[in-house]
């Protein structure tokens, strides 16, 4: 049985969600502060135990990897909380965000079918509610697509878990390694269910609508925190030794996602929609690394998604500030109107493009290294082509950011958004100079 200290982050997030939900109808401002306190407290609890001895229960692993990625999920949750405005329509937003974060923390430590499914569905159901809270047409459309596709993905995942249990007699994920026919079908269904959460082609249709129609907090969490948790689950399953169809499927999804995601993003003039389609390509890079089976692939996948999270949060924050229906021309001269927002957007886009000196540069480097180590030459060629396309359309936006415009200065940015933009930019630049600070932690966390 895990110790109280190991369960403390889960307890804090669960208790915070219930308390924030009770406070929301009459004291929505207090609900935001409760959510912020619970997220910070859970982050501190995870950070203080990073170097603690590993533990294991039937449902959850209490190891360094779950603590590190759980910490990133909580920090991304704090960043997503900055998108919730006190005067917004979402009184229940803080509580729902805590529930989604709780699901992410559970998923990072999942070693059993029950905890895997529970973590994924906590994230999905909380995000569905967050998506539709504004109750306008774009939000309802985004929520509807996410709900329908999420239900199909959940059914697919459950069927995979059921077949795995039928083949092995166990619901522990480590028992799913093998070459039996039933396990082959189980691995294929598991991959399809998780591919939806990671937004791999052809399960990506919800992503552009989520980034443009859903509230900023929901889009930020779906794009950053939830994907950190899902990649952690993929890394754990990848280590089990699943049938060959797992690697084959990952490689196929990866190649198509890199190509179609970047080509679709290339044609977008809207900031948020471009970020939505490009996130499909970024998911493809991660899947490509894991498909190789290279020794460095798990560390590369985790490093990439962790460095991707602050860049996406910063870019979505700026997109929310200027209006997520904004077109590329509306970014013209933003660095002169809102210096912090413009600088943060430029740093985020440079990192997403994988250019020096940014965290994203080393993210691309470790992915390419894993592809070379695994001799996945076709995937490497697609990844290089996708990166070149990405650099082109990201730099299109960056060029406009610094172009002088006669528009007057915009209103000041609120302090939660200033804090998010400043912290995200600092992380992007710090990891662009010292990637070893994170990479060493990830390598130490892997078995």
From Swiss-Prot:
It is found in: Cell inner membrane. It comes from the Bacteria. Its main location: membrane. It catalyses: a quinone + NADH + 5 H(+)(in) = a quinol + NAD(+) + 4 H(+)(out). The keyword tRNA-binding does not apply. GO terms for cellular component: plasma membrane. Keywords: Cell inner membrane, Cell membrane, Membrane, NAD, Quinone, Translocase, Transmembrane, Transmembrane helix, Transport, Ubiquinone. It is a multi-pass membrane protein. Disulfide bonds: none annotated. The chain crosses the membrane at residues 4-24, 27-47, 68-88, 92-112, 113-133, 146-166, 181-201, 215-235, 245-265, 280-300, 302-322, 342-362, 376-395. GO terms for biological process: ATP synthesis coupled electron transport. Signal peptide: none annotated. The keyword Mitochondrion does not apply. One of its GO terms (molecular function) is NADH dehydrogenase (ubiquinone) activity. InterPro entries: NADH-Q_OxRdtase_suN/2, ND/Mrp_TM. NDH-1 shuttles electrons from NADH, via FMN and iron-sulfur (Fe-S) centers, to quinones in the respiratory chain. The immediate electron acceptor for the enzyme in this species is believed to be ubiquinone. Couples the redox reaction to proton translocation (for every two electrons transferred, four hydrogen ions are translocated across the cytoplasmic membrane), and thus conserves the redox energy in a proton gradient. Belongs to the complex I subunit 2 family. NDH-1 is composed of 14 different subunits. Subunits NuoA, H, J, K, L, M, N constitute the membrane sector of the complex. This is NADH-quinone oxidoreductase subunit N. It comes from Cereibacter sphaeroides (strain ATCC 17025 / ATH 2.4.3) (Rhodobacter sphaeroides). The gene is nuoN.
